[in-house]
Amino acid sequence: MLEGCILAVSSQSKSNAITNNSVRGAPNGVSFAKLREPLEVRGLLDVQTDSFEWLVGSRRVRQAAIDRGEENPVGGLEEVLAELSPIEDFSGSMSLSFSDPRFDEVKASVDECKDKDMTYAAPLFVTAEFINNNTGEIKSQTVFMGDFPMMTEKGTFIINGTERVVVSQLVRSPGVYFDETIDKSTEKTLHSVKVIPGRGAWLEFDVDKRDTVGVRIDRKRRQPVTVLLKALGWTNEQIVERFGFSEIMMGTLEKDTTSGTDEALLDIYRKLRPGEPPTKESAQTLLENLFFKEKRYDLARVGRYKVNKKLGLNAGKPITSSTLTEEDVVATIEYLVRLHEGQTSMTVPGGVEFAVESHDIDHFGNRRLRTVGELIQNQIRVRLSRMERVVRERMTTQDVEAITPQTLINIRPVVAAIKEFFGTSQLSQFMDQNNPLSGLTHKRRLSALGPGGLSRERAGLEVRDVHPSHYGRMCPIETPEGPNIGLIGSLSVYARVNPFGFIETPYRKVVEGVVTDQIDYLTADEEDRHVVAQANSPTDENGRFTEDRVMVRKKGGEVEFVSADQVDYMDVSPRQMVSVATAMIPFLEHDDANRALMGANMQRQAVPLVRSEAPLVGTGMELRAAIDAVTWSSHKTGVIEEVSADYITVMADDGTRQSYRLRKFARSNHGTCANQRPIVDAGQRVEAGQVIADGPCTQNGEMALGKNLLVAIMPWEGHNYEDAIILSNRLVEEDVLTSIHIEEHEIDARDTKLGAEEITRVIPKLSDEVLADLDEPRIVRIGAEVRDGEILVGKVTPKGETELTPEERLLRAIFGEKAREVRDTSLKVPHGESGKVIGIRVFSREDDDELPVGVNELVRVYVAQKRKISDGDKLARRHGNKGVIGKILPVEDMPFLPDGTPVDIILNTHGCRVVLNIGQILETHLGWGAKAGWNIDVLAGVPDWASKLPEELYSAPADSTVATPVFDGAQEGELAGLLGSTLPNRDGEVMVNADGKATLFDGRSSGEPFPYPVTVGYMYILKLHHLVDDKIHARSTGPYSMITQQPLGGKAQFGGQRFGEMECWAMQAYGAAYTLQELLTIKSDDTVGRVKVYEAIVKGENIPEPGIPESFKVLLKELQSLCLNVEVLSSDGRAIEMRDGDDEDLERAAANLGINLSRNESASVEDLA
């Protein structure tokens, strides 16, 4: 039953890694890679899916644990229940145990949960066993523990209809840490050590400037370390025997005034519990509870593993105890003393000798990941401890004969823990669905923030900086640019997480100078003990290093040359150190790191286009990323039985049939369009893992975030000054950079105090023209074109009862309730939006849909908007350059090649040279070669520049796709040679010279060639989600602030443009007194003047004198609230009375003009009508 419900975790993510070479039906392309990668990229979602499978205890994870040598492995939920069991009452006569967690089938499909705002969850059941120890009676029941959110096959959760991701947290590992500092007064090197548990009190030892060894228990006052040893039962003779080699320990023992175990215990108790009367028994109990009882102290498996490893204890033995032992404490003190005295090694009683050194807290050997399974487990553990107290109390209050497990258990704490974690935790985040790459990166994100982690305010430079131990584990490039820089990272391509939460990276084993195909995964501290060569170190066909001296890195990131027989390991791939997004930047090695960071981040901001196009110049990472992110792959080998726009059915060779439902024009979390298309035909044979359907931003199974455009790098009339961009109108007319954006609009009908709201087509004071697109069931029809202010769903709300006039009472008597007044509260298209209605969802209590309390009906309308590229939109390149479109030129005005081909985009030369990312120039050259094709003349022998190229690269047809993997791609000499070997066009002419430049002609009236050759080629351009349509805003009249009566600010509030202090200074500088007066009064917050000016304009009269601004009156009120008597005096010294807008003339004028003076802070533009 348990296996049948972890169903959401996809089998395809567990399949072996997929590359262009291993997938049938993958795009035909050529690669410039010179190295053979012995290891393919693993499933990129495994960091999420493996952790969740461990939590629920899947059979696959258990088997993997057994293969590693673990005995009786258990899942995360089972582990928590085992810790909790048994719960005994205060007398020990009754106990309650939990075991065997299992799940039923999920209640609804993923699509149904998204539609109906449900949580994708499965019911969790456990077996509860109550034992009466007095009678031996056992009562066993299956208890429902609530609905447990399940992970989808793409590594996400659906919570209340919203797709969310749980981010892995990077935290300091439990264990023992030795540190050294410099004393400011004496400049002596001081050493200290902290024993940090997973749960419980900290134990700290240190050597002070007077050379005494002290201890702090639970961060209380410091006392001699010998007091703790005596409290543990050690005599002076035992201390001298173990620590006789150390002068500082002998000095500490001499200064210790306690004489025996009892006195030491009492001394510790006084420090920990000042003011309480000390007794030997209470002191003994306190010390045991602090460090030696599993209920109060837990090192965790990983903490015990780290303590054993650093102190050389129990080497090779299975991990059993999770509390401290006496030997742990003694070995820690000895290590500290030897470290302070400058010794480099020590031997523990077991005979194990190991190095003595201080530790770097930022080293990845000391930082681990809390993945999704552990984060959920920790939350459940906390709430189960609360449930334990309730169970214990109920055992004492209920009748023993009537007790059953069900009556003892209250599941509300557990249900609340799960809801709280997924709904409010800093690590449970709204999934980034801007494009498939952004979602994939979000699932592989590592965050040092969150509960139990760092805060961005307190984090220093050291923890944010790139560390040598990050190599192959966390990408040194991809991180945010703001205050979170260095605190949020991304998992490297080949990295994986081991059972203890440490990040491992693979290396090839080197034996006596020969590189083997054996792959070992090493943690950061294991890697420190070895000498590692880089992946591109030259080897012969037998794997033997061809050079006598090999470049390697050693502990601490030190790089040096050593002989080949000293090398222990070799990188598996040059792209091993970077993340998925960074690995998709071609010629990354030629870009400045800061620009590469921007490029990696901006790929996640690209919006899906109407027609996706894979890059001409890729890196080979595009297919693997797309498979794990968004495309559908066949789970089994078979034949396509049926294909339609909505689903694909595969008949597998084993006789089973599987259907894959495709998403059609669905709205993502970020309003982009998610649409899947089949790329196979009925009757076609497919292999397991083969891509059968494209998604947004993919083409033929490859990630396709942008468009290949013909680029000219040159200044043009100053319109592309700095980072501005000039585009051809062809891109607008042919929808090359057009994207679809879908907005969701929602309205509900509730029960109010004045009666029920009603969704209806009958709305007072609205003409039939306004309601023309509303169908009979009161909702706008699908396919209708709507603009801002138009009604999507008609709704009326009862008005508040007022005193009726005699005429109204007569109407009410004649027509009954039909005459009562209602208010129009229809759902309308927000200001600045428009589009076509593509979908409607209606949920009603009458149809038994689950709705919030008080809601009778809920309507969602989806409006799609096709946004063509326009001035002000933001474009970017994969190398970190970004710019705003400054001008869109007619095609005939664009510069053109000698054969008449106009360029698509003109970029400024400064954007290439100044920002140190030459990779974009190399991409431009290779892009032209890929588009035109090439043929290397090898009849007279292979040219020197092509000697390292594979034979399949000697020629390539036009419109080829090429891959240039990071750190293993095309070289500059090879590019120069390829440009000189490009194929001619249909007229037999080569457009671009061997230097990558071409003669361009002015497309305007002259048609003359430009006086200098221009770099021309194909570059991959991304359209970012910073679109001008979302930002442009204008207002003539609108809502005002209730207090100051000034216009509100911002597009969301339909606010005005602020005329601030500096703008006033500019007006004063020009002496524009009357303009300034107008801006500060009648155009702002002179409420009386506003109406009078309106009246004067309507009547054609002169504009009257402005009055007193409302903000001035607010200032007076604030001063009066400080008990200051403030008066406003006229020029002749008379006091002027400040009235609060009760001017009768104002009211009369407003009534005549139909102005509602009570309107403040209106909710929408329509309220102003």
Swiss-Prot record:
It is an enzyme of class 2 (transferase). One of its GO terms (cellular component) is DNA-directed RNA polymerase complex. Coiled coil: none annotated. It catalyses: RNA(n) + a ribonucleoside 5'-triphosphate = RNA(n+1) + diphosphate. InterPro entries: DNA-dir_RNA_pol_bsu_ext_1_sf (IPR042107), DNA-dir_RNA_pol_bsu_external_1 (IPR019462), DNA-dir_RNA_pol_su2 (IPR015712), DNA-dir_RNAP_su2_dom (IPR007120), DNA-dir_RNAP_su2_hyb_sf (IPR037033), RNA_pol_bsu_bac (IPR010243), RNA_pol_bsu_CS (IPR007121), RNA_pol_bsu_protrusion (IPR007644). Keywords: DNA-directed RNA polymerase, Nucleotidyltransferase, Transcription, Transferase. GO terms for biological process: DNA-templated transcription. The RNAP catalytic core consists of 2 alpha, 1 beta, 1 beta' and 1 omega subunit. When a sigma factor is associated with the core the holoenzyme is formed, which can initiate transcription. Belongs to the RNA polymerase beta chain family. PANTHER family: DNA-DIRECTED RNA POLYMERASE I SUBUNIT 2. This is DNA-directed RNA polymerase subunit beta. It comes from Mycolicibacterium smegmatis (Mycobacterium smegmatis). The lineage of its organism: Bacteria, Bacillati, Actinomycetota, Actinomycetes, Mycobacteriales.
